[in-house]
Curated annotation (Swiss-Prot):
Transmembrane segments: none
A molecular function GO annotation: microtubule binding
Residue ranges of the region described as Globular: 1001-1231
UniProt-recorded name of the protein: Chromosome-associated kinesin KIF4
Pfam family, one: Kinesin
Lineage, uppermost ranks: Eukaryota, Metazoa, Chordata, Craniata, Vertebrata
Location of the Kinesin motor domain: 9-337
Function: Iron-sulfur (Fe-S) cluster binding motor protein that has a role in chromosome segregation during mitosis. Required for mitotic chromosomal positioning and bipolar spindle stabilization.
Binding-site residues for ATP, renumbered to this chain: G88, Q89, T90, G91, S92, G93, K94, T95
A GO cellular component annotation in the UniProt record: chromosome
Gene Ontology biological-process entries: microtubule-based movement; mitotic cytokinesis; mitotic spindle midzone assembly
Listed cofactors: [2Fe-2S] cluster; [4Fe-4S] cluster
Gene that encodes it: Kif4
Residue stretches in coiled coil: 351-1000
Length: 1231
């Protein structure tokens, strides 16, 4: 018996989660508002929805469970089925609400979801009912990509055995699903935890732990009274955690994730269609439960025998407003569903009758499934053109098959021949090895013919004759081996050309056999090329081995020479070290000067001998390295030969395997052909039978056709009358058709424009959401920088700041960051207001009744025709445009395929050229080895001639050495005299410097040897010197160069200013003298004509400043310091520190100075005159005699010239009030 109750609606609970951190960072705002004390939620400004329960973001899990779910559990113990369904967008909190990620460790956690709380409540109620016996069974499944997977089964293979069956009395059953009997709550929790671990979860852009499947946790409860065994109740509790609906542009899913999302949305769409059908009475009784497996499993829960609660989970963020609105509408439609739950009573007799009825129904279904008819074939005769093309095609196919057969046979024969060649090569290698052993035994060649003549023993003579014959046989065998090697190379080349010249076969009907033949031909070609390359490599290796054997004696000889040379070098090195030590000791002792000179000469001789020996040693080592490189090349060639042989063996094995597979395939195909022929015979028999039946039916149809013709004639007359009436009606309707068409066209155009503008608004809304997300990220970054104390970036979005704001003090930086944050937050609020306004307009435009109102405006068939005509015209134009685009796309694809074919051909051509180049390279290497062998033989001959020359030259060298020693002794004596002369010159220059310093200290005019500064690139100028009485012209033997002489003329003394008139008188007696050109080695400083601004200047290139020794123009020079004169004066004081100290005339000390200098900068004219005077001084040469006292003579000869230079300087300084006018100006510090 079943006790029926009234239909009750599906209860709906709305739960809203709080904003997550990602949404807060993106600047999302809340788009939902809740009415206090009422189960009502408002979207935007005026869009409201009412449900059974509404839970705002602050509601806890326990309140949700006690308010909405707990009443269902009490009905379960009364025999009612119950379902708790969680639906919503991905990331809206469904799994959190249901407790899909629950573990045993979270038992006392307040945030546990619905499923663990249901388990606790169930066992709590069971413990209270002691007069009932309970049997609880648990099952857990998931629907992943429209496949049912058992989460309690360890192996996923059982998933193929799970099927859905429908029982008219008990409802939906799942056959093959694992059900576990549980006794306590911990067993149930362990089953839940096991299923949660097996459930498919993945990460998307919206949720890091997104459920990728629909999960259903079912608890089956059977309760019996202990006193009455016949009365029992059965009930099921389904706890459903649906996967969230998602959009690909937000989740950014790809690959498997995208496929999963498509299947999830498909299942939810079918569920929505079922909910719409159940909630709308106008659509009739048909409900599309069979569109997906999810709706079939929930068939009892929606509109069936169950108390159902739907928990709609939504996100409050305005970026998810569209999905939130869809969820709210979805839940609102679910409230209209009416379920009819009943108490499930299960007596045994009712169960038996039910099973019998089920068997009968299944038998009927089975009989119906075996019935059916075969459709008749339609024979169409081909045209003559088609027939000729088919015949031509058949002939080409037969020819192709014949050619492919011949190609496969030729490939097989080639493979066999190549295998034989490989075997003969292996035998040949063994014979060559034995032949090599015989050659080694025959290495010591003896003139056996003479030995036979001298021997007397007859038996010994016979043995020696046999040995002679064997030697002749060995020589013949070696010649034959060389000929065979060349023959194999030639045959490999011929076979290669044969394979290459084979014609390309077209595609035959039997694709597999053609591919097999082509593969065999390709592998045969590769094998031939491999044999050819192997033969070339072996010949090259053999040639290089012969060269190595010939190099062996040369190597031993060179090794001995290297040892001898190294010993000689060591002995000479020791002798050199001893001489160096003796020279060092001799320097300390002045009496051993001659002996040290001999030792120094001997040291130079030893160094020359050591250099010659090292050179010879290096040449010998080069030849040894050549031997090592050839050995390395030979080993590398042998390794390549081994690899090529292995490759050849693998290729042969592959060819055999391919042939075996082809043989098996051919055998199987022959067997299938026999079976098909047998079936064809049976079909021919059935066809004859059907033809007889068809003949009988055609006779019956002929009679019926005649009857139908008579009825047709009567019908024609009736239709003619109806046509006349229709034409009259059409004339009346055509008048109003034109106005209707125009009206429908305008209306459809307006509707399409509204839909297009709605889509554009959605696009603008997405753009605003992205902009707000970027602004929120900028605000978060600025706040982090403000907390960390960093300066703001140089460039910020939507605002620019001045240089002072960016690089100001810390307080200014903090103010700028605060202003930027304030500005961005203002823009963020503006974007949020724009988003809310757009969303509200979209809500108004996309009302739920809009599609219904749109089609209800078409009331008559005439309006529908006009609308369809307009839409068809638009569709045709769009189709034409699509076809044009497709044709252009196909053309581009065809051109791309042609380009790919050309590329493939070019690649093949390149590979062919590469193989030819490798062969040429091997041949060139052979020629190189032959040349090396020839050069080595020439080298031996040249060494022999060198030894003979060395023996003849050794006697002449001894005579030359004796004369060389005598000359060395004379040179040592001369060197000692030069050293003494140098010491005297140094003492003379030191005395000269002291003399000039004394003259300066006594305020007399210094008489120094003037230095010659002649620029290397300046022209030689002849300046006539002053006349000197009784001047003796002497040959210049030595040129002196002193920088100190210029430093004394930089600042004239007060006494020189007083004697200005006398100097002017002396200048009139000036006599020209001939200049002497100075060598470039004695010149210091640069001689630039320009600004000294780049590295062409010698001073700047050496990273030094230009000074007075430079011949550049000081007015143009940019490489001089302003305080050059002061630094020169300081250096002069430091040089004369040992004798006395000169005071700086520019230094002014309060109370000590005898006058106060006037601060005045020199004019450009004065500077130019002084620079000209300095240049004249630099360019005038001097003659230095080599008498007993050359320094004193030079001072006397230059006294007249020094007066002329001093006169020009005094004239320049007299024009100003201070002698500071000739110096560089010094910047005064502001006090």
């Amino acid at each position: 018996m079943k006790e029926e109750v009234k239909g009750i609606p599906v209860r709906v609970a709305l739960r809203c989660r709080p904003l997550v951190s990602k949404e807060i960072k993106e600047g999302c705002q809340t788009c939902l508002s809740f009415v206090p004390g009422e189960p009502q939620v408002v979207v935007g400004n005026d869009k409201s929805f009412t449900y059974d329960f509404v839970f705002d973001p602050s509601t806890e899990q326990e309140e949700v469970f006690n308010t909405a779910v707990a009443p269902l559990i009490k009905g379960v113990f009364k025999g009612y089925n119950a379902t708790v369904l969680a639906y919503g967008q991905t990331g809206s909190g469904k799994t959190y609400s249901m407790g899909g990620a629950y573990t045993a460790e979270q038992e006392h956690d307040s945030a546990i979801g619905v499923i663990p709380r249901v388990i606790q409540l169930l066992f709590k109620e069971i413990n209270k009912k002691s007069d009932f016996e309970f049997t609880l069974k648990v099952s857990y499944l998931e629907i992943y990509n429209e496949e049912i997977l058992d989460l309690l089964c360890s192996s996923r293979e059982k998933a193929t055995q799970i099927n859905i069956r429908e029982d008219p009395k008990e409802g939906i059953k799942i056959v093959g699903l694992t059900e576990k009997t549980v006794l306590v709550a911990s067993d149930t929790v362990s089953c839940l935890e096991q299923g949660n671990n097996s459930r498919t979860v993945a990460s998307t852009a919206m949720n890091s732990q997104s459920s990728r499947s629909h999960a259903i946790f079912t608890i089956s409860i059977e309760q019996r009274k202990k006193n009455d065994k016949n009365s029992s109740f059965r009930s099921k509790l389904h706890l459903v955690d649906l996967a969230g609906s998602e959009r690909q542009k937000k989740t950014k899913a790809e690959g498997d994730r995208l496929r999963e999302g498509i299947n999830i949305n498909r299942g939810l769409l079918c569920l929505g269609n079922v909910i719409s059908a159940l909630g709308d009475d106008k659509k009739g009784n048909f409900v599309p439960y069979r569109d997906s497996k999810l709706t079939r499993l929930l068939q009892d829960s929606l509109g069936g025998n169950s108390h159902t609660l739907m928990i709609a989970c939504v996100s409050p963020a305005d970026s998810n407003l569209e999905e939130t609105l869809n969820t709210l509408r979805y839940a609102d439609r679910a409230r209209k569903i009416k379920n009819k739950p009943i108490i499930n009573i299960d007596p045994q007799a009712a169960e038996l009758n039910h099973l019998k009825q089920q068997v009968q129904q299944l038998q009927i279904l089975l009989l119906q499934a075996h019935g059916g008819t075969l459709p008749g074939d339609i024979n169409v005769e081909p045209s003559e053109n088609l027939q000729s093309l088919m015949e031509k095609n058949q002939s080409l196919v037969e020819e192709n098959e014949k050619l492919s057969r011949g190609l496969s046979e030729a490939a097989g024969q080639t493979a066999q021949m190549l295998e034989r060649i490989i075997l003969t090569e292996q035998a040949n290698e063994k014979m060559n090895a034995k032949l090599e052993e015989l050659r080694r035994h025959a290495a010591c060649k003896v003139d056996l013919q003479k030995l036979v003549e001298t021997l007397e023993d007859q038996e010994l003579k016979e043995n020696i004759e046999i040995i002679c014959n064997l030697q002749q046989v060995i020589a013949q065998l070696s010649d034959e081996a060389a000929a065979c090697m060349t023959a194999t190379i030639d045959t490999a080349g011929e076979a290669d050309t044969q394979v290459q010249s084979s014609p390309d076969t077209s595609r035959s009907s039997d694709v597999f056999s053609t591919q097999h033949a082509l593969r065999q031909a390709q592998m045969s070609k590769e094998l031939i090329e491999l044999n050819k390359a192997l033969a070339l490599k072996e010949a090259l290796a053999k040639k290089m081995t012969q060269n190595d054997n010939q190099l062996q004696p040369i190597q031993f000889q060179y090794q001995d020479n290297i040892k001898n040379l190294e010993s000689e070098v060591l002995s000479l090195q020791r002798e050199k070290e001893e001489l160096v030590l003796e020279l060092q000791t001799a320097k300390k002792d002045a009496n051993q000067a001659k002996l040290s000179e001999r030792r120094r000469k001997r040291l130079q001789e030893l160094e020359g001998q050591i250099a010659d020996l090292k050179k010879k040693l290096q040449e010998q080592s080069k030849l040894l390295k050549l031997k090592e490189s050839t050995e390395h090349t030979v080993s590398k060639l042998n390794q390549e030969i081994r690899m090529m042989k292995n490759q050849r063996v693998q290729l042969m094995r592959q060819m055999k395997e391919d042939a075996e597979k082809f043989r098996q395939w051919k055998q199987q195909k022959d067997k299938e052909v026999i079976q098909l022929k047998e079936r064809d015979r049976k079909r021919q028999y059935e066809l004859l039978k059907l033809e007889r039946n068809f003949q009988k039916q055609s006779n019956v149809l002929r009679r019926k056709t005649e009857e139908a013709a008579a009825a047709n004639k009567r019908l024609k007359d009736a239709l003619q009358k109806q046509k006349e009436v229709a034409e009259k009606r059409k004339e009346t309707q055509s008048r109003g058709m034109e106005s209707t068409a125009a009206r429908m066209k305008n209306w459809l155009g307006n509707e399409i424009e509204v839909m297009v503008s709605t889509e554009e608004a959605k696009r603008h809304l997405n753009g605003l959401l992205e902009e707000r997300k970027i602004l929120a990220q900028d605000v978060a970054q600025l706040k982090e920088k403000r907390e960390s104390g960093e300066n703001p970036p140089l460039k910020l979005r939507r605002r620019t700041f001045s240089y002072d704001e960016i690089h100001g003090q810390d307080s200014g930086a903090e103010d700028s960051i605060a202003k930027q944050i304030e500005s961005l937050e203002t823009e963020l609020e503006l974007r949020s207001a724009q988003i809310a306004d757009l969303q509200q307009k979209l809500l108004d435009a996309e009302s739920e009744d809009r599609p219904k109102q749109r089609w209800e405006s078409i009331a008559t068939i005439l309006e529908a025709k006009c609308a369809i005509k307009y839409l068809v015209g638009e569709l045709v134009s769009s189709k034409i445009l699509v076809s044009k685009l497709e044709s252009s796309l196909n053309q581009s694809k065809a051109s791309c395929i042609d380009v790919q074919k050309m590329l493939f051909e070019e690649q093949n051509h390149f590979a062919k050229i590469e193989t030819e180049l490798k062969e040429e390279l091997v041949k060139v290497e052979q020629q190189h080895q032959e040349k090396v062998l020839y050069l080595l033989s020439q080298l031996q001959q040249s060494q022999m001639t060198e030894k003979q020359l060395e023996e003849s030259v050794s006697e002449k060298e001894q005579q030359l050495l004796s004369t060389l020693k005598c000359q060395e002794e004379e040179l040592r004596k001369m060197q000692e005299v030069c050293e003494q002369n140098q010491q005297l010159l140094q003492e003379n220059s030191a005395i000269k410097q002291k003399l000039t310093l004394l003259q300066v200290a006594s305020k007399q005019k210094p008489h120094l040897t003037r230095n010659i500064f002649q620029s290397p690139d300046s022209s030689f100028e002849y300046i006539p010197p002053k006349p000197k009485p009784c001047r003796i012209k002497e040959k210049c033997l030595e040129q002196s160069f002193a920088v100190e002489g210029l430093q004394y003329y930089s600042e004239p003394s007060v006494a020189e200013q007083d004697n200005e008139d006398s100097d002017d008188h002396a200048d009139e007696e000036w006599i020209p003298t001939k200049l002497v050109k100075v060598s470039k080695k004695s010149i210091q400083g640069c001689s630039c004509k320009g600004w000294c601004g780049n590295k062409q200047c010698g001073c700047r290139k050496q990273k030094s400043d230009c000074n007075v020794s430079c011949s550049c123009d000081p007015t143009k020079c940019r490489n001089r310091h302003q305080n050059q004169d002061n630094s020169d004066a300081i250096e002069l004081n430091q040089d004369s520190e040992n004798s006395f100290k000169l005071e700086d005339p520019t230094e002014v000390t309060s109370g000590l100075s005898f006058f106060h200098p006037i601060c005045a900068t020199p004019s450009s004219k004065i500077l130019k005159e002084m620079c000209d005077a300095d240049q004249v001084q630099l360019k005038q040469p001097v003659f230095v005699s080599s008498s007993d006292h050359p320094e004193l003579k030079s001072i006397a000869s230059e006294s007249q010239e020094n007066k002329a230079i001093g006169k020009k300087k005094k004239r320049a300084l007299a024009s100003n009030t201070s002698f500071f006018s000739g110096c560089s100006p010094i910047q005064e510090e502001s006090h």
